[in-house]
Amino acid sequence: LNEENTLTKSREESKYFQLLNGEWNFRFYNTIIDVEDGFYAADYEINGNYDKIKVPMNWQMALDKGYDTPNYTNSDYPYPCDPPYVPDDNPCGIYIRDFDIDENDLSRDLFLNFEGVDSCFYLWINGKFVGYSQVSHMTSEFNINDFVQAGSNRLAMLVLKWCDGSYLEDQDMWRMSGIFRDVYILKRSRRGRIRDFYVTTELKKKYTKCIMSVDLDLVGDREVSYRLVSPHGESIDSGESVNGKIKIKFDNPILWSDEDPLLYDLILDVSDEVVLVKVGIKDLVISKSVLYLNGQKIKIKGVNRHDSHPLYGHATPIEHVLEDLYIFKRHNVNAVRTSHYPNDPRFLEMCDQLGFLVIDESDLEAHGFSTSIDGFFFERWSLLANDPSWKEAYIDRARRLFERDKNHVSVIFWSLGNESGCGDNHQAMYDFIKSRNKNVIVHYENANYRYSELAGKFLGNCSDVESWMYPSIEKCKEILSSKKRKNKPLYLCEYCHAMGNGPGDLGDYWELIDSDDKFCGGCIWEYTDHSVAIPDGNGKYKYTYGGDFGDMPNAGNFCVDGLVYPDRTPHTGFEEAKYVY
């Protein structure tokens, strides 16, 4: 374990990283009521009722097995809207696999990580209950030292299709379940390690001087040795932390931008562990309704991107994610909104290194309340947002987003979610993020002045930008001239819907965007057609819509509304976007 290995190797190459992806034993149940007792026991015999399933993979994508049904719905909940309850006939899957632990590793702290499981899960190891977690698109981590032994160990999970958290995950997408991101064990030092860290930078004297601060959360009584290396390989500073803090002052910092994504290497050494942090230095501010990056006015030329693959569902291979970003670069896209949930953690590493502006979105949408219950439109839409019993669930989603992604320079806006009305719980999310860093920019579209008028009270305190969806060009002009905007820049989090032969009006929008500094740009809805590919009987695949699997409710062909086909072949509209951007 040394600095050289840390600088050159991926996580998969570390001996302290144990990947558990691969074939797992799996059994599907149409209802949790039918789940047999004792499946989690250490000596449970896996019988012929179990199949093999690939992890990561949504169980609905095992089309030949008939586990459940792929279901595409936009805003309608796929079950009766009665929070916090979900149907008793709740489909679920049992996952079982054995894994080995080396005896030497028992002297380290062992952390089992799940980067994405939809919608919730219960976890056992060697017959003992370890814990429970939900929030589908966020990492869940468990210390498993009290549950494992040297040699073979049995891991068992019960994953439910729906839970109370599903009321906050009503995104426009194919509804799919199971383990859809990586599973692995981290083997951490007990004698001394970095539990967490937060790197911030402050620029002074017209960007000629920089103060880099690192707040460390340490395990053990050791301080941290550090070394800072410039993007060009020059050693800037080295030393040791004091009381868990590092402060580095240096001249002529090299700034990060989407066009010139230069990153410093910060090496943190606790003797038993070495951590490499890729640090970007930027100055992002809003001044007099204008968005500035490093003192220059910037425009967001963005797209909304879902995790979607025609063969793998939400279990999008990381190579496929990288290819998406290359496609963006080839089409002059400089910004990505992670609609409508956090992406794979490595996505932001790629955005840091390739140069993208990221609107990083919480895993939160409650769109179905706008249509599924009685009452005034905005009041019912904001039902959970104004319910104190849901406050901690909202804050939890903001906290887990921010703490996971806080060290990524590519993030320009922290988004509180999508289409969930607006209420006190959104304000609590905003307040939490600002308590961690008062200088970051927080985004939420349902806090714009149109919704304040509908709600009969001002909602704009939980968003630093005036964000709208699909306003006409004339409406944009009205917004830009309105005092109701409260000196916030106008940003279109969704515009120019790309369904069919769209988007056809990009040029007209960008004439206005380019003519007004208060208009900072927008993100086209959306990047890719969502579809499940099925064999056509002739050795090829055909793409499906909502309802093609008998799924109800469904939103039909509204899932194919992207700039590219499911296989990423560009539509003609993407060529127009490339030209305009």
Model-derived features: positions:
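N-terminal pre-domain segments of enzymes
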Residues: L1-L19, N25, I32-V35
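Extended substrate-binding grooves/exosites of carbohydrate-active enzymes
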Residues: L1-S10, I53-V55, A62-K65, T73, ...
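Accessory beta-strand-rich segments of carbohydrate-active enzymes
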Residues: S10, N25-T31, Y50, M61-G66, ...
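Short strand-turn-strand beta-turns centered on an Asx-Gly dipeptide
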Residues: W124-V130, V229-P231, S271-D272, N294
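Extended acidic/polar, glycine-enriched regions
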Residues: D146-S152, D215-S287
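Surface beta-strand/loop "capping" patches
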Residues: R190-G220, P570-Y581
